[in-house]
């Protein structure tokens, strides 16, 4: 699974427009100075495969195809959030001989409503060609149950909606139910998300792909913020892009280093001991 997701580097505040005002007392008309970085994350290997910069989050739509073009993703499963749920991106993934699982939200209202309607009535209608997968986990004092329901009968969707998506084979619903302890007793939370995919009818595989997508947030973006203080570094020009690339490379090395210590502790150990530093730089698995 290769997860594509963007992250705003808050410390990289200077945009192309802002450069024109450098050395003056004037301010750019647009407040959007921050740099936005789109990354490709190999979820199973814990490695950042590539990155491309944009100056606004909305530019992810044009940046993602460029990033995909630079990668060898043959036979991979590409997961992207709703921002990347675009026909051009789906076509690019299929052209690269890969599969996709794309989140569907209100940016494709008709498609979203049709999928939502199907999963509202499916338990009563009991349609055929449906796959269901359930899994429950406990951790951090909470119980979490995830249910994935997938259907490959695309005739439930409007023809204009599904025929324009390259390689589309299934649409799915992932329901997450959490029971979280609280001072006044357990609290229940429920979240429902919808997806389209080029994968064959396999609810377990789709559920696994969706689950792995979140590793880009937990294992990459969170680590860059907390362990490398990426958002607090004030950088200009290409420095922000270069530091982001070096930080991701260092993070991958630290993750594959055999020690069970945290990323922060591994960094300290490398700073204190040349032997540890050499061992990290010599990680063969990386």
Locations of regions flagged by a protein language model:
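Conserved, well-structured functional cores that handle cations and Mg-NTP chemistry
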Residues: 1-80, 85-88, 260
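Short, hinge-like loop/turn segments at secondary-structure boundaries
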Residues: 20-21, 96, 117-121
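Generic secondary-structure signature for well-ordered alpha-helical cores
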Residues: 69, 98, 120, 124, ...
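Short, surface-exposed basic-aromatic patches at helix termini and helix-loop junctions that form
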Residues: 90-98
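Short hydrophobic alpha-helical runs that function as membrane-insertion/retention elements
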Residues: 99-104
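An anionic, glycine-rich sequence signature occurring as long contiguous blocks
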Residues: 105-211
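Short amphipathic alpha-helical "interface-anchor" segments enriched in bulky aromatics
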Residues: 200-234
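A short, flexible helix-boundary coil/loop motif
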Residues: 223-286
